[in-house]
Amino acid sequence: MSTGGCCVNSPAASSVRYLTAEDLLNLNHAITGDPMVRDIHLLHSAVRRPRLLLFGEPQFPTLAGKAAALMESLAYHHLFVDGNKRTAVQAVTHFLARNGQHFSYDAARDADFVLAVARGEYDTAAIAAWIEERMSANG
């Protein structure tokens, strides 16, 4: 099923600017001072997940969906020794900024949600809806 141009948040796949494994390592280093990867395969999986295709169609067609897939992969799978949830939030912030969007995260307001993501209490669609509520165009 094609999503066509139905959604404002549906970028052309070639125009999306994704984070790399190096970007994630740098974010975790800035947070913890010493990025220690628990599982390098999970790191590469987290980087690839927002780009997934299912029967030739993006599994996550919106920027919020791609950001949610990234957040879930980082927070839930605990691929770093420390700073997974903080890295997940920063990864979403940087991914959206690279793609012309501002992410409004307030630790006092939003920390419980991120903790719940880390415990596996929300699916990717719910995470995407939460991110969408906190997104606005840069500028």
Task: List each language-model region with its residue ranges.
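FIC/Doc superfamily catalytic core
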Residues: 1-139
